[in-house]
Protein backbone atom coordinates (compact mmCIF):
# COMPACT_ATOMS: atom_id res chain seq x y z
CA UNK A 1 0.00 0.00 0.00
CA UNK A 2 1.35 3.44 -0.94
CA UNK A 3 0.22 6.81 0.38
CA UNK A 4 -2.17 7.42 -2.53
CA UNK A 5 -3.93 4.12 -1.83
CA UNK A 6 -4.01 5.02 1.87
CA UNK A 7 -5.66 8.39 1.20
CA UNK A 8 -8.18 6.93 -1.26
CA UNK A 9 -9.13 4.13 1.13
CA UNK A 10 -9.92 6.58 3.92
CA UNK A 11 -11.49 9.15 1.57
CA UNK A 12 -14.01 6.57 0.35
CA UNK A 13 -15.02 5.85 3.94
CA UNK A 14 -15.19 9.33 5.49
CA UNK A 15 -18.02 9.76 7.99
CA UNK A 16 -17.61 13.33 9.18
CA UNK A 17 -16.86 16.82 7.89
CA UNK A 18 -13.68 16.88 9.99
CA UNK A 19 -12.43 13.71 8.31
CA UNK A 20 -13.09 15.20 4.87
CA UNK A 21 -11.16 18.31 5.92
CA UNK A 22 -8.16 16.25 7.02
CA UNK A 23 -8.22 14.17 3.82
CA UNK A 24 -8.36 17.38 1.78
CA UNK A 25 -5.17 18.58 3.44
CA UNK A 26 -3.43 15.26 2.76
CA UNK A 27 -4.50 15.31 -0.89
CA UNK A 28 -2.96 18.76 -1.35
CA UNK A 29 0.39 17.78 0.12
CA UNK A 30 1.59 14.49 1.61
CA UNK A 31 5.06 13.79 2.92
CA UNK A 32 5.47 11.21 5.66
CA UNK A 33 8.53 13.16 6.83
CA UNK A 34 6.58 16.40 7.19
CA UNK A 35 5.36 17.46 10.64
CA UNK A 36 2.29 18.99 9.01
CA UNK A 37 1.37 15.72 7.31
CA UNK A 38 1.98 13.73 10.47
CA UNK A 39 -0.10 16.14 12.56
CA UNK A 40 -3.00 15.87 10.11
CA UNK A 41 -2.73 12.08 10.12
CA UNK A 42 -2.82 12.05 13.92
CA UNK A 43 -5.99 14.18 13.94
CA UNK A 44 -7.57 11.99 11.25
CA UNK A 45 -6.78 8.77 13.09
CA UNK A 46 -8.20 10.14 16.33
CA UNK A 47 -11.42 10.85 14.45
CA UNK A 48 -11.53 7.37 12.91
CA UNK A 49 -11.08 5.80 16.34
CA UNK A 50 -13.72 7.96 18.03
CA UNK A 51 -16.17 7.16 15.24
CA UNK A 52 -15.51 3.44 15.75
CA UNK A 53 -14.17 2.91 12.22
CA UNK A 54 -12.08 0.07 13.57
CA UNK A 55 -11.95 -2.10 10.47
CA UNK A 56 -10.87 0.84 8.34
CA UNK A 57 -8.07 1.64 10.78
CA UNK A 58 -6.88 -1.96 10.66
CA UNK A 59 -6.92 -1.98 6.86
CA UNK A 60 -4.44 0.91 6.83
CA UNK A 61 -1.87 -0.94 8.95
CA UNK A 62 0.15 -2.30 5.97
CA UNK A 63 1.12 1.23 4.96
CA UNK A 64 2.51 2.15 8.37
CA UNK A 65 4.37 -1.15 8.73
CA UNK A 66 6.47 -0.10 5.72
CA UNK A 67 7.74 2.97 7.59
CA UNK A 68 10.94 2.11 9.40
CA UNK A 69 12.42 3.86 12.41
CA UNK A 70 15.58 5.70 11.33
CA UNK A 71 16.85 6.91 14.67
CA UNK A 72 14.88 10.15 15.00
CA UNK A 73 12.32 9.71 17.78
CA UNK A 74 11.12 13.31 17.35
CA UNK A 75 9.78 12.21 13.95
CA UNK A 76 8.83 8.68 14.92
CA UNK A 77 6.51 9.43 17.84
CA UNK A 78 3.78 10.62 15.43
CA UNK A 79 3.93 7.27 13.60
CA UNK A 80 3.86 5.57 16.99
CA UNK A 81 0.63 7.41 17.88
CA UNK A 82 -1.03 6.21 14.68
CA UNK A 83 0.08 2.63 15.35
CA UNK A 84 -1.38 2.96 18.85
CA UNK A 85 -4.74 4.01 17.38
CA UNK A 86 -4.67 0.97 15.09
CA UNK A 87 -3.71 -1.30 18.00
CA UNK A 88 -6.63 0.05 20.02
CA UNK A 89 -8.94 -0.65 17.07
CA UNK A 90 -7.65 -4.23 16.94
CA UNK A 91 -8.48 -4.67 20.63
CA UNK A 92 -11.93 -3.15 20.07
CA UNK A 93 -12.56 -5.76 17.36
CA UNK A 94 -11.78 -8.58 19.78
CA UNK A 95 -8.03 -8.78 19.27
CA UNK A 96 -5.81 -10.37 16.64
CA UNK A 97 -2.54 -11.88 17.83
CA UNK A 98 -0.82 -11.64 14.45
CA UNK A 99 -1.64 -7.95 13.94
CA UNK A 100 -0.91 -7.08 17.57
CA UNK A 101 2.52 -8.71 17.26
CA UNK A 102 3.29 -6.82 14.06
CA UNK A 103 2.77 -3.52 15.87
CA UNK A 104 4.55 -4.77 18.98
CA UNK A 105 7.65 -5.71 16.95
CA UNK A 106 7.72 -2.23 15.39
CA UNK A 107 7.40 -0.69 18.86
CA UNK A 108 10.07 -2.93 20.41
CA UNK A 109 12.55 -2.11 17.65
CA UNK A 110 12.34 1.54 18.65
CA UNK A 111 12.44 0.75 22.37
CA UNK A 112 15.58 -1.38 21.93
CA UNK A 113 17.29 1.34 19.88
CA UNK A 114 16.45 4.03 22.41
CA UNK A 115 17.86 1.98 25.26
CA UNK A 116 20.96 0.58 23.55
CA UNK A 117 23.33 3.50 24.06
CA UNK A 118 23.85 6.26 26.58
CA UNK A 119 23.45 9.08 24.07
CA UNK A 120 19.74 8.28 23.81
CA UNK A 121 19.07 8.26 27.56
CA UNK A 122 16.85 11.33 27.44
CA UNK A 123 14.52 9.49 25.05
CA UNK A 124 14.53 6.49 27.34
CA UNK A 125 13.46 8.73 30.21
CA UNK A 126 10.71 10.24 28.07
CA UNK A 127 9.52 6.79 27.06
CA UNK A 128 9.35 5.58 30.66
CA UNK A 129 7.37 8.68 31.66
CA UNK A 130 5.02 8.55 28.69
CA UNK A 131 4.19 4.95 29.45
CA UNK A 132 3.39 5.28 33.14
CA UNK A 133 0.30 5.57 35.28
CA UNK A 134 1.57 8.98 36.35
CA UNK A 135 1.18 10.12 32.76
CA UNK A 136 -2.48 9.09 32.83
CA UNK A 137 -2.98 11.14 35.99
CA UNK A 138 -1.26 14.08 34.32
CA UNK A 139 -3.63 13.83 31.36
CA UNK A 140 -6.63 13.86 33.68
CA UNK A 141 -5.29 17.03 35.28
CA UNK A 142 -4.89 18.57 31.81
CA UNK A 143 -8.49 17.72 30.93
CA UNK A 144 -9.72 19.53 34.03
CA UNK A 145 -7.60 22.53 33.09
CA UNK A 146 -8.97 22.52 29.51
CA UNK A 147 -12.54 22.44 30.79
CA UNK A 148 -11.84 25.38 33.08
CA UNK A 149 -10.21 27.34 30.22
CA UNK A 150 -12.88 26.22 27.71
CA UNK A 151 -10.12 25.18 25.29
CA UNK A 152 -12.07 22.62 23.25
CA UNK A 153 -9.36 22.01 20.64
CA UNK A 154 -6.73 21.10 23.20
CA UNK A 155 -9.24 19.16 25.28
CA UNK A 156 -10.08 17.07 22.20
CA UNK A 157 -6.39 16.31 21.70
CA UNK A 158 -5.87 15.38 25.35
CA UNK A 159 -8.88 13.06 25.51
CA UNK A 160 -7.87 11.33 22.27
CA UNK A 161 -4.32 10.92 23.56
CA UNK A 162 -5.47 8.86 26.52
CA UNK A 163 -6.18 5.83 24.32
CA UNK A 164 -2.67 6.13 22.89
CA UNK A 165 -1.16 6.31 26.36
CA UNK A 166 -3.01 3.16 27.37
CA UNK A 167 -1.72 1.26 24.34
CA UNK A 168 1.81 2.47 25.16
CA UNK A 169 1.42 1.02 28.63
CA UNK A 170 0.14 -2.29 27.20
CA UNK A 171 3.17 -2.56 24.91
CA UNK A 172 5.64 -1.54 27.61
CA UNK A 173 4.13 -4.14 29.95
CA UNK A 174 4.72 -6.76 27.24
CA UNK A 175 8.35 -5.72 26.86
CA UNK A 176 8.98 -5.83 30.61
CA UNK A 177 6.71 -8.82 31.33
CA UNK A 178 4.57 -6.74 33.67
CA UNK A 179 0.88 -7.15 34.43
CA UNK A 180 -1.42 -4.69 32.66
CA UNK A 181 -4.22 -2.97 34.58
CA UNK A 182 -7.40 -3.56 32.53
CA UNK A 183 -9.12 -0.61 34.20
CA UNK A 184 -6.99 1.65 32.00
CA UNK A 185 -8.77 0.30 28.91
CA UNK A 186 -12.09 1.25 30.50
CA UNK A 187 -10.74 4.75 31.11
CA UNK A 188 -9.65 5.11 27.48
CA UNK A 189 -13.01 3.90 26.19
CA UNK A 190 -14.77 6.42 28.43
CA UNK A 191 -12.72 9.25 26.91
CA UNK A 192 -13.44 8.10 23.35
CA UNK A 193 -17.14 7.96 24.14
CA UNK A 194 -17.04 11.49 25.55
CA UNK A 195 -15.55 12.68 22.25
CA UNK A 196 -18.72 11.62 20.40
CA UNK A 197 -20.45 14.58 22.07
CA UNK A 198 -21.47 17.42 19.73
CA UNK A 199 -19.08 19.71 21.61
CA UNK A 200 -16.14 18.11 19.76
CA UNK A 201 -17.79 17.73 16.34
CA UNK A 202 -15.63 20.37 14.69
CA UNK A 203 -12.48 18.33 15.30
CA UNK A 204 -13.86 14.75 15.20
Locate each region found by the language model:
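Extended alpha-helical scaffolding segments
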Residues: 154-190, 197
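Boundary/linker segments of alpha-helical solenoid repeat arrays
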Residues: 69-77, 111-124, 152, 195-202
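Solenoid-like repeat scaffolds
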Residues: 27-35, 63-74, 108-116
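N-terminal alpha-helical interaction modules that lie
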Residues: 1-41
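Alpha-helical repeat scaffolds
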Residues: 21-27, 57-64, 96-111, 138-142, ...
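Structural signature of alpha-solenoid helical repeat junctions
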Residues: 36, 56, 74, 78-81, ...
